[in-house]
């Protein structure tokens, strides 16, 4: 049985479409490889940015801990300063010639208790179970912050020597000034680190969203369209082949 020219033309039409679909599929495969190559590089950069951002974020958390240490130390020094003021008052009273020995003894007893209270304030000032009046190193966003807060000696304090109290109060003032400067420096570091973290995350999102996600989604959409066309062509070709086979029987 002869196959009509129209049938042959229809067969060639579907075969040509199938071939074109196959060629397009190959082009898309090459495109996938190209996209994968680019996005692999972008992923590596994005991973690096994510790691950098995580490191910065942890540094910021460490910096906040450092500020917490300094704030607790400053609060303790505020109480100690008040105690030192009271010692200074007692020292002035001790110079009152009208006081008898019993009254002076009472002043010395109060001074001793205040001195013990000052020592307790130094010893009991803790952050997360650690005494804040020591040297601590904190790895923060831009390096290492060191808090060097050594407790002041109180052995030389005496209400019989106002100079000893004045000297102690001067040391307290210097220590509190260092704490204030430290808090300001760490706060500035935190602000810069947070901005760096935001920039890193924005760069990471741009890499993933603009390159990988968009390109891959575009490819997938086109690839599905081509596969659908190829599938239709293949199905039509199979139907033609079936008809030809039936005609040849």
Swiss-Prot record:
Molecular function GO terms recorded: structural molecule activity
Annotated compartments: Secreted; Host cell surface
Protein function: Plays a role in virulence.
PTM annotation, UniProt: The secreted form is about 1 kDa larger than the whole cell lysate form, presumably due to post-translational modification. A 22 kDa form is also found in the secreted fraction, probably resulting from proteolysis.
Gene: flaC
Consequence of gene disruption: No visible effect on flagellar structure, cell shape or motility. Adheres to host epithelial cells (human HEp2) but invades less well (14% suriving bacteria, determined by bacterial counts from lysed cells after 2 hours of gentamicin treatment).
Organism: Campylobacter jejuni subsp. jejuni serotype O:2 (strain ATCC 700819 / NCTC 11168)
Gene Ontology cellular-component annotations: bacterial-type flagellum; extracellular region; host cell surface
Entry keywords, A to Z: Secreted, Virulence
Main location: secreted
InterPro entries given in the database record: Flagellin, Flagellin_N
Name of the protein: Secreted flagellin C
A Pfam family: Flagellin_N
């Amino acid at each position: 049985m002869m196959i009509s020219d129209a049938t042959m033309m229809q067969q060639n039409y579907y075969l040509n479409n199938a071939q074109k679909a196959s060629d397009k599929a190959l082009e898309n495969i090459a495109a996938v490889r190209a996209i994968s190559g680019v996005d692999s590089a972008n992923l590596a950069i994005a991973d690096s940015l994510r790691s950098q951002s995580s490191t910065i974020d942890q540094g910021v958390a460490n910096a906040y801990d450092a500020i917490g240490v300094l704030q607790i130390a400053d609060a303790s020094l505020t109480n100690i300063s008040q105690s030192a003021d009271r010692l200074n008052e007692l020292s002035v009273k001790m110079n009152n010639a009208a006081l008898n020995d019993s009254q002076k003894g009472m002043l010395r007893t109060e001074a001793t208790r205040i001195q013990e209270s000052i020592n307790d304030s130094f010893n009991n000032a803790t952050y997360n179970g650690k005494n804040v009046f020591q040297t601590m190193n904190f790895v923060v966003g831009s390096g290492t912050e060191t808090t060097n807060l050594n407790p002041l000696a109180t052995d030389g304090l005496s209400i019989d020597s106002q100079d000893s109290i004045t000297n102690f109060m001067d040391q307290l003032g210097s220590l509190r000034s260092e704490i204030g400067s430290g808090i300001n420096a760490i706060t500035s570091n935190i602000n810069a680190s947070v901005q760096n973290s935001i920039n890193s995350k924005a760069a990471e999102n741009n890499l993933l969203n603009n390159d990988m996600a968009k390109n891959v989604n575009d490819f997938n959409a086109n690839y599905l369209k081509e596969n659908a066309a190829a599938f239709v062509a293949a199905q039509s070709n199979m139907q033609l082949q079936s008809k030809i086979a039936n005609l040849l029987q």
